[in-house]
Every structure is written in structure tokens, then in C-alpha cells.
Regions:
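Hydrophobic alpha-helix immediately C-terminal to the catalytic Tyr-X-X-X-Lys motif of short-chain
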Residues: 148, 152, 156, 186, ...
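N-terminal Rossmann-like NAD(P)+-binding domain of SDR-like oxidoreductases, especially those catalyzing
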Residues: 1-172, 212
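A glycine/serine/threonine-rich, flexible loop-to-helix segment
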Residues: 128, 179-187, 248
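Generic recognition of short, well-ordered alpha-helical segments
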Residues: 15, 63, 79-82, 177-181, ...
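C-terminal substrate-binding subdomain of Rossmann-fold SDR/epimerase-dehydratase oxidoreductases
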Residues: 14, 190-298
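Short alpha-helical
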Residues: 11, 36, 75, 177, ...
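Structural element of the ATP-grasp superfamily
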Residues: 98, 153, 186, 279-280
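A general structural signal marking secondary-structure boundaries and capping sites
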Residues: 37, 72-75, 79, 84, ...
Length: 298
């Protein structure tokens, strides 16, 4: 299997590359190396791994491959609220460029376009769970650019016949995640003997999925040759930010006195909750939050 990965030096992308190489698949990794990228990885000199430093909105050629999987994206909500230009360039124009490059290939050489999206495209809801059939109602510039990219992908399938997959992942956590995210920030604060900052009262609910479980779902979808469909990927662990911080603290024999409450964030959605039933039925996928957390922080 030949896989072209964009954003393979990032958090989720790097775990995907690692698993693909373990399977003996060949990887070409295109990444522009942002502040959150992994600059050095154990497989840099692997015989089946090729790295190309490039911006997906600017590349003009695609190597031949079976699947093009797009992890490349700006993803920090706070940054998108302060300045959305780079989000539009990477998350919309970058996807458009990749689709155009695929469209320019002869039909026999067109790869599956596997687009990694987010559960944030749905917006928030106070109860129940979103399914893949629900309307998209993004509520901040980041999620709006991801929703726009999805519309581009669907339009290129309908107009030009380009095969696609779209996954909408919930909050991922795990090794190599940049410290701006909640769980690595908790770990950093514990290491430095600082208090963990929790925005607002910590009651905002997120769905937490271990990154390796997420990657396993992506691999299953590829191996089962599923295409032209959309899947949520979520462990369905609906926990508040405060609960997650307390859970991490327990692993280090710390108590909630190590938490401090700070000003709320702009553009904060109250609750994200999506159903993964469609994915589970299609692939047999079965994640586990607590065991994932043990693997990560234990």
C-alpha cells in the first residue's frame, strides 16, 4: 500500500505514519513543519518513509499513491479567533489544491482522498449525540474552515467522480500532542509543579479519544476499502474538562488543589457529543478511554 500523508509530522498524523510503517506500507509525508510539528521522529531514515517539506496550498505535484490522507490543518480554536487567515489558507485553500491535483490525474491514477475533519463542524448541543446525517453548524473560524473543506471534498466527488472518505474525530489525546491542548498541558503543569489552568468552571463537555484508537479506526477504514462515505470517530467518553484534569491528577497522587480556574475562552462550545455507531458497525472498532489514559500518563 502506498500512502501520501499530509501533516504527518503533526500529532495524529505522526501516529498514523508510525502504524502504517509497522504494516510495511510505503509513506510519502508532506508537511510544512509548523510550531506544533515534530521536527524529528524515530522513522526519519526508514526505508519506506520519504519526507517532503512543503505547504499543501503550494505544492504542484502529487506522487503516485493509493490513498492521500489529509491531516494537514491549523487546529487551535483560540488562534483562529485571533487571526483566521492562516486557517483559511491551510484548511480550505490547501484542500482545494490537493483536490485539483487529484483531478488533474488520469482516472486510473487517482488516489482515494481521505480527509480528516473534526466533530466541531456540528457545533454544540446540550443533550443527545450528533450522527453523520446531522447538519453542520460550525461556531468558530477553525470549525468553519473544516466544514468548508468537507463541502469541497463532497463537491469534487459529485462533479469529478473523485473517491473520498471523511472522518470527524472527537478530542484526541496521547503521546506527541502539543502542550497547548488540555491533557499535555496538565502533564506539563504537574511536571513543573504549577497549577493546571481550567477555563470557566470546567463544565464544558468533550468526547475524549486516545490517538491510537483514532488511528486504528482510520487503518480499518482503509483496509476494508470503504469509500465515498462519512464517519464519526469518537470513543463516546463525555467528560468535562474539569473531570479530565482531576483524572490526570489522580495518576500522580495529586488533588484538585492543583487546579486554578481562569477566564473563559472565546468561542467556547458547551458540549460536543457524536455517535460512532456507524463506524463500529462498519469496522468493529472498539475504543477505551481509561485504558488509553493509563497508557498515556501511566
Amino acid at each position: 500500500m502506498k500512502i501520501l500523508v499530509t501533516g504527518g509530522r503533526g500529532f495524529i498524523g505522526s501516529h498514523f505514519v508510525e502504524e502504517c510503517l509497522a504494516k510495511g506500507w510505503s509513506i510519502v509525508d508532506v508537511d510544512k513543519l509548523t510550531y506544533a510539528s515534530n521536527k524529528s521522529l524515530p522513522w526519519d531514515n526508514h526505508k519506506n518513509y520519504t519526507f517532503i517539506k512543503a505547504d499543501i496550498s503550494e505544492i504542484d505535484h502529487l506522487p503516485s499513491c493509493d490513498v492521500l490522507i489529509n491531516f494537514a490543518a491549523e487546529s487551535h480554536v483560540d488562534n483562529s479567533i485571533k487571526s483566521s487567515d492562516v486557517f483559511v489558507k491551510s484548511n480550505i485553500l490547501g484542500v482545494h489544491n490537493l483536490l485539483e491535483l487529484i483531478r488533474g490525474k488520469p482516472s486510473y491514477d487517482r488516489p482515494l482522498f481521505f480527509h480528516i475533519s473534526t466533530d466541531e463542524v456540528y457545533g454544540d448541543r446540550h443533550d443527545g449525540k450528533f450522527t453523520e446525517d446531522d447538519k453542520l453548524k460550525p461556531s468558530n473560524p477553525y470549525s468553519a474552515t473544516k466544514a468548508a473543506a468537507e463541502m469541497l471534498v463532497l463537491s469534487y466527488h459529485r462533479t469529478y467522480g473523485i473517491d473520498y472518505l471523511i472522518t470527524r474525530s472527537s478530542n484526541n489525546y496521547g503521546e506527541r500532542q502539543f502542550e497547548e491542548k488540555l491533557i499535555p498541558k496538565c502533564l506539563q503543569c504537574i511536571k513543573e509543579d504549577k497549577k493546571i489552568p481550567i477555563h470557566g468552571d470546567g463544565s464544558y463537555v468533550r468526547d475524549w479519544t486516545y490517538v491510537k484508537d483514532n488511528v486504528n479506526a482510520l487503518i480499518l477504514l482503509i483496509e476494508k476499502n470503504i469509500k465515498n462515505d462519512v464517519f464519526n470517530i469518537a470513543a463516546e467518553n463525555y467528560l468535562t474538562n474539569l473531570t479530565v484534569a482531576k483524572e490526570v491528577l489522580t495518576w500522580y497522587n495529586k488533588n484538585e488543589n492543583c487546579i486554578k480556574f481562569v477566564e473563559n475562552r472565546w468561542g467556547q462550545d458547551i458540549r460536543y457529543a457524536v455517535s460512532s455507531e456507524k463506524l463500529k458497525k462498519a469496522t468493529g472498532w472498539n475504543p477505551d478511554f481509561i485504558n488509553g489514559l493509563k497508557k498515556f500518563v501511566g
